[in-house]
Amino acid sequence: MYAIIETGGKQYMVREGDVLKVEKLNYPEGEVIALDKVLAVSFEDGNVEFGKPYLENVKVTAKVLEHGKGPKIRVFKYKPKKNYRRRQGHRQPYTKIQIEKIEK
């Protein structure tokens, strides 16, 4: 059984027990959250249900494992012959979650 969920403006295909990094969620570590923006779900018997745009009766529960920052990305811009150089770094925050249950 798998589900396609939406969180942080992105879509993820998840199964029970999956661990994935999503955009930062404002929940403390260890809390169980409900992801209710479910776009599609596939059952063991092969049936697939799609939402318009979301399924009302399907809920995915996940546990927040940790918060962190991704790898550093360096942005460098310059103008030739003008001695203008700017360097900036960015680390995207993320939340690591584990899918516990997909229930209808």
Curated annotation (Swiss-Prot):
Record-linked InterPro entries: bL21-like (IPR028909), bL21-like_sf (IPR036164), Ribosomal_bL21 (IPR001787), Ribosomal_bL21_CS (IPR018258)
A biological-process GO annotation: translation
GO molecular function: rRNA binding; structural constituent of ribosome
Cellular component per GO, a single term: ribonucleoprotein complex
Keyword Ribosomal protein attached: yes
PROSITE patterns reported for this sequence: RIBOSOMAL_L21
Annotated keywords: Ribonucleoprotein, Ribosomal protein, RNA-binding, rRNA-binding
Family statement: Belongs to the bacterial ribosomal protein bL21 family.
Quaternary organization: Part of the 50S ribosomal subunit. Contacts protein L20.
Function: This protein binds to 23S rRNA in the presence of protein L20.
HAMAP family: Ribosomal_bL21
Protein name (Swiss-Prot/TrEMBL): Large ribosomal subunit protein bL21
Species this chain originates from: Caldanaerobacter subterraneus subsp. tengcongensis (strain DSM 15242 / JCM 11007 / NBRC 100824 / MB4) (Thermoanaerobacter tengcongensis)
Gene (name only): rplU
